[in-house]
């Protein structure tokens, strides 16, 4: 941010955090701790500083600021504030403060109520009565005492606050602040905006706040961070508050935040909460369902899209799009609108009125759709959910001919893959794949608990890595049937609007065996095997563009687009016996046809990979699922199951293969009824599939035939067909525009947060999620509201019971254990400050670095010395050396380092690490500024400021281009208009090749990153020939490769490339917001022109650094410019170049911790 904006932002944030403190605590006392030299080491211990109330302190601060004559002095005053100490006399009445604050706020919103709420409540109650059979007791929002009276089996009483209940724990929102803290933060953010709300917004706010008040006053169940419940069971048996009260409060808070989204329908938000109170487990699903059909019948005018047929290349044209909706589709919509159980829903009414609509109106409806997911995660009891999931009923009347065709297709595909897999390994003489397979094991659960030795003590643990180490020592692992004979334990995943899903927890042997096969399948799918019908072939860095072909089809409306959804895919019949036998017979046939030597087949820990794969498949044909519910008195259930096990390494890619075989079989047989069926595009992604079809057949007949063909394979499907819109993998493509739902719930979480992460880092990830929601549709006002809610409660850290430290916003938006690790604009990294003043910048650096500490726990170091750990790394290193035929000491060290990091997955080790980091950071806060503490390294801003100070800056404005990818975010639109829109996943034109990294990653069996090369390089004296040579041969380079590389003098250049590799590898430094903007050297040259004699690879690095800083500038200042360097003399040029090279050697890049999983 430039100085003025930085000052405004800093002051506003400080003011907001102080005001929040004054509102939620009874007369807190606050003092400022400044950066001023002082003798006393523990400055914040002295209490007499705590004199002012927050408001008095703000007045004094503002007075001081008014007395400053220049902007720099004002900024200096604020940057000298290191943190505030907050002393709270009495905390017990915080809940009461919030209760009275709630009622005063409601009274200030004196507007009328909505009428339509009762209508939809009535419909929800009707639905509940009609579907009573399929609902469990905990799906009803009934008083807690009734629930406990009728469901004793669901709880285990311990006589105190530590009783257990899986089911009741699923009714907690799992937010990392107490519920009353969240209400306080919401009220704080709402109160500060009361003057600017419209009448409609006030109506919605009043309804939502009254809902919160009702639940808050009734009471609710809560669990503290140390896993104690707020009530004991005997207390609960006398209380009448409802089961879902705390979840309703959180859902209402989410809807209040969405009142700030633009565009949105306020009344619909209230309806969501109304329905949620009646049918909490089904509200989101029922309210969001109509979208799938609507996207196929709705149309609006936009532009045609041209694509090259290559998935990631598409561009909008100036021609208007074609629109076509058949009568059959309209009829289908009318029927489903009539029969929808909740057709009083505002969203459904809007849909019905807007079948022919505009882009803006569609965006409003789409935002309403996204909002239904914000009621939060649905969490069912694992036993109930898994039983529902795996029991699919089959009939025996299948079409044998189709079945055989499906089985044969699948077997042929898998056989081809296996042949390819073995041949690749034989050709490279790469037999022992142990190192690769073991390094890919994550330290997750192994399914059952086992007593193992950990350093100096025996612990019971379920962690894969510790089981593996123990099995290696006892040499008891190669009998797969023994490992699988315990049955397969189940874990769960919770998502909004869907029933809880089971996850199979398979023993580590399965993951190790399947790893290399899965890798090989993925690799081939990525290269576009089978006409590129796998979504994996489209894992471009910009997944948004991979839908180019579909965007084209929907904008031209000449093809029928068929999207099918197989219900209960994993448990369907075609996934049972045929899927498993296809694997088994594919392996047997591949072996029979090609006579390679049995000894040459890949092995993991001396187990033959293909033999073991057959064993696994045979076992899974008839497996026992063990479903326990430890927090209840339910007995453990054992279920026989034959379907696909989600939890295998090959699940997703195996599903995709089965899906291709299935859809091709269905289409082949459909051709007998529809001779002119021509397929122009087929895409599968796990169990989703989409096909574009040219045919003269009518749309309703096509749907009917496809459904028949599926059901003769015994697969139950929803087959939807349309000309102008479809849904795939949670993205909606309509009329040539791509929409993504902003459906990340912020105030609920899938699981309880661990005690081992600081509140700040959790808050950081919430801010990031809110930024993504805002960017995908809710807009900038929603994001600023979310920050007002999330930041103030997380801005302070507890020191003792009554003393808290409120940190400076600069420290909060930096990196480290007490920081959000995100910028105030929602990009990953730390906040930016652009200034020409060295003194201010040093203060800024001090603030960003005060709390940045990283500690390696002792237990990691200790475990690395044990026999168990050494055995695992020895096995891996030996396997690597068998592949490379040289000792490769540096690679061996990389293996050891990577394996050491896995020890963090052991319970308590991660907690230990985080706790010690937090306490260390707090300790550092206690040390005043000493003269010998100097801020380390250069920040990229300094490079940016250096260039800008020698350039002519011209502010520009550009016309907005037509976009295919829908966003609601001003800075992104500005950047797109200046830099254009990424239309292909093109490599930055001349990304210099890092030869060393390419050579080593080709040799190494484990995945390595450029930073690993850098770490190892520090251990050698690279100024001598011998040092260089040792370094390279330790990385595994031999013979000619080694000689040629040494002679090419490229080592230092490649190491520099390794250091800046992050600049190239993260499109938009991992932030979703930037994936559609081309961030490469070409773009940088549109903004900056530098006239300096820099060597080409340095020139690129400098340009990219400048571009990234420029992006931060646009995000915070919302304006664009171009900067051209002055004509300067040779001497000046030499001085600047020297400065730049000095900076590049010591620059500190952000470590970004949030990148969106979707990409």
From Swiss-Prot:
One of its GO terms (biological process) is viral genome replication. It catalyses: RNA(n) + a ribonucleoside 5'-triphosphate = RNA(n+1) + diphosphate. Keywords: Nucleotide-binding, Nucleotidyltransferase, RNA-binding, RNA-directed RNA polymerase, Transferase, Viral RNA replication, Virion. GO terms for cellular component: virion component. GO terms for molecular function: nucleotide binding; RNA binding; RNA-directed RNA polymerase activity. It is found in: Virion. Its main location: virion. Belongs to the reoviridae RNA-directed RNA polymerase family. RNA-directed RNA polymerase that is involved in both transcription and genome replication. Together with VP3 capping enzyme, forms an enzyme complex positioned near the channels situated at each of the five-fold vertices of the core. Following infection, the outermost layer of the virus is lost, leaving a double-layered particle (DLP) made up of the core and VP6 shell. VP1 then catalyzes the transcription of fully conservative plus-strand genomic RNAs that are extruded through the DLP's channels into the cytoplasm where they function as mRNAs for translation of viral proteins. Interacts with VP3 (Potential). Interacts with VP2 (Potential). Interacts with NSP5; this interaction is probably necessary for the formation of functional virus factories. This is RNA-directed RNA polymerase.
């Amino acid at each position: 941010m430039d100085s003025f904006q930085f000052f405004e932002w800093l002051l506003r944030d400080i003011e907001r955090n102080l005001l929040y403190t004054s509102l939620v605590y009874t007369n807190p006392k606050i003092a400022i701790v400044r950066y001023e030299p002082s003798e006393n080491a523990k400055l914040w211990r002295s209490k007499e500083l705590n004199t002012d109330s927050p408001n008095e302190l703000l007045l004094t601060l503002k007075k001081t600021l008014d007395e400053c004559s220049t902007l720099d002095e004002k900024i200096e005053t604020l940057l000298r504030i290191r943190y505030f100490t907050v002393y709270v006399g009495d905390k017990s009445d915080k809940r009461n403060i919030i209760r009275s604050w709630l009622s005063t706020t409601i009274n200030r919103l004196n507007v009328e109520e909505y009428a339509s709420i009762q209508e939809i409540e009535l419909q929800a109650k009707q639905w509940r009565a009609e579907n009573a059979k399929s609902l469990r007791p905990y799906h009803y929002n009934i008083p807690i005492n009734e629930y406990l009276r009728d469901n004793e089996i669901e709880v285990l009483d311990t006589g105190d606050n530590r009783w257990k209940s899986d089911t009741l724990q699923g009714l907690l929102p799992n937010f990392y602040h107490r519920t009353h803290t969240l209400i306080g933060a919401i009220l704080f953010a709402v109160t500060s905006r009361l003057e600017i709300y419209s009448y409609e917004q006030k109506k919605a706010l009043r309804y939502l706040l009254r809902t919160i008040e009702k639940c808050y006053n009734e009471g609710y169940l809560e669990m503290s961070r140390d896993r104690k419940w707020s009530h004991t069971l005997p207390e609960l048996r006398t209380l009448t508050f409802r089961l879902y009260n705390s979840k309703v409060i959180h859902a209402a808070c989410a809807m209040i935040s969405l009142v700030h989204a633009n565009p949105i329908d306020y009344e619909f938000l209230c309806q969501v909460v109304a329905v949620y109170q009646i049918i909490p487990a089904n509200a989101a699903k029922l309210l969001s369902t109509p979208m799938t059909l609507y996207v196929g019948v709705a149309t609006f005018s936009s532009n045609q899209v041209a694509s090259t047929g290559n998935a990631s290349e598409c561009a909008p044209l100036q021609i208007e799009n074609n629109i076509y909706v058949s009568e059959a589709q309209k009829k289908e919509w009318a029927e489903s609108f009539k029969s929808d159980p909740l057709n009083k829903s505002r969203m459904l009414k809007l849909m019905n009125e807007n079948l022919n609509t505009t882009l803006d109106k569609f965006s409003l409806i789409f935002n309403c759709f996204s909002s239904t997911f914000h009621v939060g995660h649905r969490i069912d009891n694992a036993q109930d959910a898994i039983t529902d999931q795996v029991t699919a009923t089959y009939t025996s009347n299948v079409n044998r001919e189709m079945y055989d065709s499906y089985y044969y297709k699948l077997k042929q595909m898998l056989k081809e893959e296996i042949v390819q897999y073995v041949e690749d390994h034989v050709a490279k003489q790469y037999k022992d794949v142990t190192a690769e397979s073991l390094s890919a094991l994550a330290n997750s659960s192994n399914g059952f608990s086992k007593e193992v030795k950990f350093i100096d003590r025996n612990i019971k643990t379920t962690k894969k890595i510790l089981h593996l180490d123990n099995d290696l020592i006892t040499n008891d692992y190669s009998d797969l049937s023994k490992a699988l004979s315990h049955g397969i334990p189940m874990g769960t995943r919770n998502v909004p609007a869907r029933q809880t899903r089971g996850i199979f927890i398979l023993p580590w042997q399965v993951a190790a065996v399947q790893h290399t096969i899965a890798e090989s399948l993925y690799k081939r799918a990525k290269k576009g095997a089978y006409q590129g019908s796998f979504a994996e072939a489209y894992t471009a860095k910009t997944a948004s563009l991979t839908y180019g072909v579909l965007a084209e089809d929907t904008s031209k409306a000449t093809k029928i687009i068929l999207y099918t959804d197989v219900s209960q895919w994993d448990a369907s019949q075609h996934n049972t016996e045929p899927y498993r036998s296809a694997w088994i017979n594919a392996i047997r046939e591949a072996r029979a046809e090609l006579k390679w030597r049995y000894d040459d087949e890949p092995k993991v820990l001396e187990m033959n990979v293909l033999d073991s794969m057959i064993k696994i498949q045979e076992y899974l044909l008839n497996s026992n699922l063990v479903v326990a519910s430890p927090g209840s008195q339910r007995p453990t259930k054992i279920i026989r199951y034959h379907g696909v096990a989600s939890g295998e390494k090959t699940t997703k890619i195996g599903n995709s293969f089965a899906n291709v075989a299935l859809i091709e079989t269905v289409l082949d047989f459909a051709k007998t009824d529809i001779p002119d069926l021509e397929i122009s595009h087929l895409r599968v992604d796990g169990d989703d599939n989409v096909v574009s079809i040219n045919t003269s057949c009518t749309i309703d007949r096509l749907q009917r035939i496809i459904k028949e063909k599926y059901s003769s394979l015994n697969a139950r499907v929803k087959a939807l067909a349309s000309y102008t819109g479809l849904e795939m993998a949670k993205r909606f493509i309509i009329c040539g525009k791509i929409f993504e739902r902003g459906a990340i719930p912020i105030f609920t979480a899938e699981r309880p947060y661990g005690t081992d992460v600081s509140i700040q880092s959790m808050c950081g990830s919430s801010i990031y999620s809110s930024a993504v929601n805002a960017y995908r549709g809710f807009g900038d006002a929603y994001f600023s509201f979310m920050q007002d809610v999330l930041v103030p409660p997380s801005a302070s850290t507890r020191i003792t019971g009554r003393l808290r430290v409120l940190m400076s916003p600069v420290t909060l938006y930096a990196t480290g254990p007490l920081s959000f690790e995100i910028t105030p604009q929602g990009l990953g990294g730390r906040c930016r400050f652009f200034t020409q003043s060295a003194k201010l910048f040093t203060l800024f650096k001090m603030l960003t670095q005060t709390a940045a500490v990283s500690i390696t726990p002792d237990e990691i170091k200790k475990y690395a010395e044990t026999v168990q750990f050494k055995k695992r790394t020895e096995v891996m290193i030996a396997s690597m050396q068998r592949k490379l035929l040289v000792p490769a000491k540096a690679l061996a060290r990389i293996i050891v380092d990577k394996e050491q990091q896995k020890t963090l997955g052991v319970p308590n080790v991660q907690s230990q690490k985080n706790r010690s980091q937090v306490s260390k950071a707090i300790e550092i806060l206690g040390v005043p500024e000493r003269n010998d503490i100097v801020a380390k390294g250069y920040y990229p801003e300094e490079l940016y400021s250096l260039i800008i100070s020698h350039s002519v800056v011209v502010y520009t404005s550009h016309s907005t281009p037509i976009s295919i990818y829908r966003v609601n975010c001003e800075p992104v639109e500005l950047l797109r208009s200046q830099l254009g829109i990424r239309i292909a996943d093109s490599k930055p034109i001349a990304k210099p090749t890092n030869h060393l990294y390419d050579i080593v990653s080709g040799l190494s069996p484990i995945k390595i990153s450029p930073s690993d090369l850098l770490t190892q390089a520090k251990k050698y004296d690279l100024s001598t020939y011998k040092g260089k040579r040792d370094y390279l041969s330790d990385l595994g380079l031999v013979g000619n490769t080694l000689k040629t590389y040494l002679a090419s003098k490229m080592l230092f250049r490649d190491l520099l490339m390794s250091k800046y590799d992050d600049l190239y590898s993260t499109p938009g430094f991992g932030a979703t917001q930037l994936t559609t903007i081309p961030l490469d050297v070409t773009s940088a040259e549109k903004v900056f022109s530098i006239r300096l004699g820099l060597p080409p690879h340095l020139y690129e690095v400098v340009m990219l650094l400048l571009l990234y800083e420029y992006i931060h500038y646009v995000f915070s200042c919302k304006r664009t410019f171009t900067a051209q360097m002055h004509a300067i003399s040779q001497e000046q040029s030499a001085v600047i170049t020297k400065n730049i090279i000095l900076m590049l050697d010591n620059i500190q890049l952000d470590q970004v911790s949030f990148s969106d999983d979707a990409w």
